[in-house]
């Protein structure tokens, strides 16, 4: 980390006296030439501003604090603006005998009024006058504003009388807040004092509760706009939850109710403990530093800590790689821990406000707290009571007397469907050191926690409260190690702990039947699961191996064993939980990267799973894990693949122990296909040839309606020159389904993939079938560049896509450059190591090739063309994506119809695919000029 620098004196950066002397000299040298006079003044002020900003930037990069930097920038801006004011009122529009009405005062308001300024923030100014606007004041204001714009400032300004300020402050809380922070820069001092007095007496007096209510609502609305979770992996430093604006809100409320000018002064209110006061100052400083670095790095008022900026800000703030922890992830973990602290401070502040105002203003506070004045209601648990619909405690001593109460508190809150009172929450955060190794092994504490986890009414909400308070990570240290941990990739939308708790919440929703429309299979098998406790424990601990030694899955299994043994879980359950954690990615890997219609695939999966109970547990965990990754990650296509794999594996287990798994799958496929063939022929006797030509696996992959339409499409293809295609967007689907029937040939799949990408389509899934007569039927699941179903808003675009596929199917596809999507700019932040694996054991009759690299339009075409150029035919393709990374698996055969067994050909194929992936990586656009990429995390 850079060493801390001592604060510097403002006059060592911008000498106000010397600046004014230079401006006066320039004015005297250019008397009679207003244009030259103005130009020279602007040039002098620009130099001062540039010097001030560069010194602030250099000091920040060498260890100056965030708050010191923001105050220095504010001070530099003060000197420039006040010097401009003096120049304007002395040399340009001098009032030699100013009247009472020509008095003018210039005040900084809003964030600038606080005296803390980010490098490229807007500045808000108030020109205060005693009466109506005079020609002199109007001239001064206009001249100054144009000059400030020429200096590069973005200025928010108002010209008002004191009367107008008071009236508007009563009507508008935004104006009221800006006046609250008003700070005189220059001009008539009496006007500023009069405004301050009238604002305090006529606006602030007896309106504390009203102001608090408005600010809290404003905070809630802002967080809803910016993203309600403080654990979004591209946070808004200013407006996001846990960001600077949350601290500003506390300061506004504090200053409105008490005279507070600096963050350090909050301590004088005795709102926070000494530890909490230090946390407040630490958070305030850290967030100011991050924001200043963001502005200096981008050269503009950038407030979002986007992926492309995170590595550079980490470097500037002194973070380096440490072991397996990259610098960017260490920095972002620090950011999220600070955001978490801000949430804790907000609750502590709320508790203090509530206690103080029920004592001093019993009628006022009720306007913004739920209901009327809270009523105390005794509970049948000693030390706890209900306080206005929230759970509270008799005092801190109940934790000191029995630290297990720190766990019981949350269990009682869950059982009785109560939120925590801010007093109780604050008491918990102050009692965290009481959670020792003895408490972690206490049978009562362990039983209370396990009951809450597996049988809680609202597990996500209660566990989130425990996590926010610091109890969850303290009681389960394995979980504590991933609190606030982010993974530097585009796949995950949340930190590891937030993702985990959301996944636990999804299981709770599945168990309650709330997700039956989205996950009918998971909901239907939930009552059959024998060990719910193992299910919830595995979900809670499934990602605790991230950042561990020996790989995510094995490290996670070790963590799970450690946690379960300490919780007193029986041995057989410990091993089950550890197995689930170690294998929690297996089902999604098999479903999304392998051919689930291949008996060998299902047999291999069944050998890993071993029994129906594990299969049920793994399905629910897989669904919850994928769904909790972030918006848009789960889709119906993934659900369909998981259902197919589950049903096929369940059929294996129904065949009994000792039976041949692959043979069981084959028998299941044969019976399914026989029934589907009969049903299709009954509906469409003309499909007899098509039915006879297709393999069994095809019939278990689609509904009867789909089979009927495919048969019609195949007939159309024969009539209209060898290819026919059609597309549709099914209700509730997040991808368009485009089906093409065409005569199979080498390179067909590559041509089809190129046609899709050339129209801006992104293939998120594909199924490839070939009849015994050489007729191909390929089904593509396609999104547009925004991630929406292709053509969902424009049916003509979907028709154009079908036409393009028909043309490609006939062999006359246009060689067009694939369109670049907007996501490519975000993905440019990551350095992605390509990889290729070739497996000749995964299938009985095909070689499985898996290629992983940077996702981009046209990648699927490039890989498929490489396979075609190697004289290989694609039997099936499985497209998967993890944010910036694509993982495409192909089942391929030689021209003779078998596996690729020649070692030299396998090595050449791997080299060619790696070359295609590496060329793709090398040609990827830069995120921003001058920014370096950081290695993308491969953790899932």
UniProtKB/Swiss-Prot annotation:
Its EC number is 2.7.7.59, 3.1.4.-. Residues 496-618 form the HD domain. Residues 1-379 are annotated as: Uridylyltransferase. One of its GO terms (biological process) is regulation of nitrogen utilization. Its cofactor is Mg(2+). It holds the Pfam family HD. It catalyses: [protein-PII]-L-tyrosine + UTP = [protein-PII]-uridylyl-L-tyrosine + diphosphate; [protein-PII]-uridylyl-L-tyrosine + H2O = [protein-PII]-L-tyrosine + UMP + H(+). Residues 380-736 are annotated as: Uridylyl-removing. Keywords: Hydrolase, Magnesium, Multifunctional enzyme, Nucleotidyltransferase, Repeat, Transferase. Uridylyltransferase (UTase) activity is inhibited by glutamine, while glutamine activates uridylyl-removing (UR) activity. InterPro entries: ACT-like_dom_sf, ACT_dom, HD/PDEase_dom, HD_domain, NT_sf, PII_UdlTrfase/GS_AdlTrfase, UTase/UR. GO terms for molecular function: [protein-PII] uridylyltransferase activity; phosphoric diester hydrolase activity. Residues 737-821, 848-929 form the ACT domain. PANTHER family: BIFUNCTIONAL URIDYLYLTRANSFERASE/URIDYLYL-REMOVING ENZYME (PTHR47320), BIFUNCTIONAL URIDYLYLTRANSFERASE_URIDYLYL-REMOVING ENZYME (PTHR47320:SF1). Has four distinct domains: an N-terminal nucleotidyltransferase (NT) domain responsible for UTase activity, a central HD domain that encodes UR activity, and two C-terminal ACT domains that seem to have a role in glutamine sensing. Modifies, by uridylylation and deuridylylation, the PII regulatory proteins (GlnB and homologs), in response to the nitrogen status of the cell that GlnD senses through the glutamine level. Under low glutamine levels, catalyzes the conversion of the PII proteins and UTP to PII-UMP and PPi, while under higher glutamine levels, GlnD hydrolyzes PII-UMP to PII and UMP (deuridylylation). Thus, controls uridylylation state and activity of the PII proteins, and plays an important role in the regulation of nitrogen assimilation and metabolism. This is Bifunctional uridylyltransferase/uridylyl-removing enzyme. It comes from Caulobacter vibrioides (strain NA1000 / CB15N).
